Amino acid sequence: MQKTTYYDNSTLFGGYSYQGANGFGYDAPAPAFQNSAHLEGDYQRSACSLQSLGTSAPPQPQHAKTKELNGSCMRPSLPPEHHPPPQVSPPQNTVNVAATNATQQPGGSGGGGGAGSGGTSKSSSKSSSMATNPTLTKQIFPWMKESRQNTKQKNSSPSASSANAESSGGEKSPPGSAASKRARTAYTSAQLVELEKEFHFNRYLCRPRRVEMANLLNLSERQIKIWFQNRRMKYKKDQKSKGIGSSSGGPSPTGSPPLPMQSSAGFMNSMHSMGSYDAPSPPSFNKPHQNAYAMSTAYQNPMKGCPPQQKYGNTPPDYDPHGLQGNSGNYGTPNMQGSPVYVGGNYVDAMPATGPSMYGLNHLPHHQSASMDYNGATQMSANQHHGPCDPHPTYTDLSAHHPSQGRIQEAPKLTHL
């Protein structure tokens, strides 16, 4: 019965409608395939300790079913539709196979129904192959478990010792797992001294020098590279903190160059407001500057009253020799050349420093008292009122000399006071 049904199936479906458990169709003729199936059936029976199913093995369905039997021997967890009991003796299994094929045979007995039954048999074989393949792929063998555990142990073991972390854990294991578990490298003082020395000379190492230092310090190249990266970041951080500190409390070291600029700005505004230069000026010079501002306010009105004096911005170069030959000869041409504040008489209104000595008030050379200074300022203002346009050269002399005096005369003031 079994042989006839199997041979009828093979003749009806032409020997190529069935698919093996691996999902490929078999186009070979039936006799050659019978031999291979016979060999496989014998091997699988010997492997699974099956009883003999007969001398002639059925061609293709038996091949698929023996594959299923092989899978059931490896792992007896197939779906209940093909194997209702989990572990079945082979004769019952062959009876089930024959019964399923016999039920498919009447459907294909008609002339046109062969294709339909072939489709159903294909679907059944496909379902059987799909049922066997997931069980085969889902099965986890012990060597797979061992290899995964070994790799995990390899990844976690370098964290125990720093030497392994330097060699294998840092380079071979993935960075995400190793970075969190890698031990902190402890550098000796000698290594740190050498690294700091090298960093002092050049902050970026070339690779030959890095290899040389690695051999010299018994460190890995990776450690030296990472140390230099961290050291550069620390250096940048220190530079930023220094920059912030110098900008906040910084006018003390860096303020000496800007002070002349501030003073020049104050001198430019001195014709309009008295308080502009008082702030940057040192407290010891407050008296002379206040006196000078008194003079500036005294001169301000005659300037407004005398229209020809509006040319004073252009006239100082013409009257520079006269001013240098004037009463303050000790602040001569070197001072004028040495002061960058004076540029072509642009800061003509910067007059407030030691105006009395500039104007021939040599009886007040040392600014002995505020009253005398103010008297001198009023005297000069009176003179300026009498002839506002004529003594214009002397006024330009004062304005031309002052930028140099405001910077250089501070030391003589200290000695005189």
UniProtKB/Swiss-Prot annotation:
Bias (Gly residues): 107-119
SMART domains for the chain: HOX
Gene3D superfamilies per record: Homeodomain-like
Pfam families: DUF4074 (PF13293), Homeodomain (PF00046)
Bias type Polar residues, positions: 93-106, 261-273
Alphabetically ordered keywords of this record: Developmental protein, DNA-binding, Homeobox, Nucleus, Transcription, Transcription regulation
Biased composition (Low complexity): 120-129, 154-180, 243-253
InterPro entries in UniProt: DUF4074, HD, HD_metazoa, Homeobox_Antennapedia_CS, Homeobox_CS, Homeodomain-like_sf
CDD domains (UniProt xref): homeodomain (cd00086)
Domain of life: Eukaryota
Motif extent (Antp-type hexapeptide): 140-145
Example GO molecular function: DNA-binding transcription factor activity, RNA polymerase II-specific
Single GO biological process annotation from the record: embryonic skeletal system morphogenesis
Localization in the cell: Nucleus
Location of the DNA-binding region in this protein: 180-239
Stretch list, region Disordered: 51-135, 147-184, 237-290, 381-417
PROSITE patterns assigned to the protein according to its UniProt record, in alphabetical order: ANTENNAPEDIA, HOMEOBOX_1, HOMEOBOX_2
GO CC list: nucleus
Job of this protein: Sequence-specific transcription factor which is part of a developmental regulatory system that provides cells with specific positional identities on the anterior-posterior axis.
Sequence similarity: Belongs to the Antp homeobox family.
Protein name listed in UniProt: Homeobox protein Hox-B3a
Organism this protein belongs to: Danio rerio (Zebrafish)
